[in-house]
Amino acid sequence: MNLEIKKDLVSNWFKTLQDAFCDDICKIEKNKSQFKSTMWKKNIKKNEGGGEYRILQNGKVYEKDEGGGEYRILNNGKVFEKVGVNFSEVYGKFPKKFQKNIPGAQKDPRFWASGISVVMHMKNPLIPAMHFNTRYIVTTQDWFGGGMDVTPSKQDKNEKKEFHKILKNMCNRHNKNYYKKYKKWCDEYFYLPHRREPRGIGGIFFDYKKNDFEKNFKFVRDVGVTFQFIFNKIIKKKIKRKWTSKDKEMQYIKRGRYAEFNLLYDRGTKFGLQTGGNVEGILMSMPPLAKWK
């Protein structure tokens, strides 16, 4: 399959998924809270998004087009304290210091990348924070990555069991080895070494899925649809549960851990900031309120 066709298929899927997620979130909010949508353009010169810059070449001024995207954020809803759904499609060149860590980038530093990421911070502290992302990156090689994970502030053994059962069933539809492999990867990735504790109850995490585009794209689509099912299921089950000020305090402390991970270790945050992504979109994963003790 032609590479440009692959890019179009993937980016269109991510856009479709962004719309589907936002529609479901608005339904959960009963349309009383709305997303604020921001379109942005990649600006590698300033290392931030939301603007344009121009290049003088051969006596003429050209706009530097290196892609962009759209991030949608809903704040202070009845159910969601903060939720962000970000789509991006960017291209350019990896900085030299970054090239050795990216497959194919040392051979040629040019890249194209598209992705969707979602982070949900809930008003009810009995409903866990949830995170999802999938991406497709092209250098001289091309591959998929992504995953999902859940971070409760109050443990719920039944919820954890059900969550992992759904993930295992989804993975088994594609390969019997996926769940064990990607769960282990997730447990190792979403871990705070300085705290010696996991960020949450895990999930799946995968990267560098290449060599069979159609098979891998089918899996990536299933990951997106499964996350949509999971967040609806968890939220609707717990949306009316009563909580206390002590529960909220625990949530704030857990959010502090969440912020620590994203700023210190998260691969997507580092990638976005080092490749000229939109700062607001990259940091949308940060919780609205957090505490440290």
Give residue spans per PLM region.
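Gly/Pro-rich turn-and-neighbor structural signature
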Residues: 2-103, 209-264
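A generic structural motif
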Residues: 6, 122-124, 138-140, 150-157, ...
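Long, hydrophobic/aromatic-enriched structural stretches that serve as scaffold segments
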Residues: 78-136
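Glycine-rich, often proline-containing surface loops adjacent to acidic residues and nearby aromatics
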Residues: 82-83, 112-114, 143-151, 197-211, ...
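Short conserved micro-motifs at the rims of enzyme active sites and ligand-binding pockets
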Residues: 98-100, 159, 215, 270-276
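Long, contiguous binding/interaction regions
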Residues: 122, 129, 269-293
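Compact, glycine/acidic-enriched structural inserts
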Residues: 140-184
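Long, charged, mostly alpha-helical binding arms that flank functional sites
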Residues: 170-219, 233-236
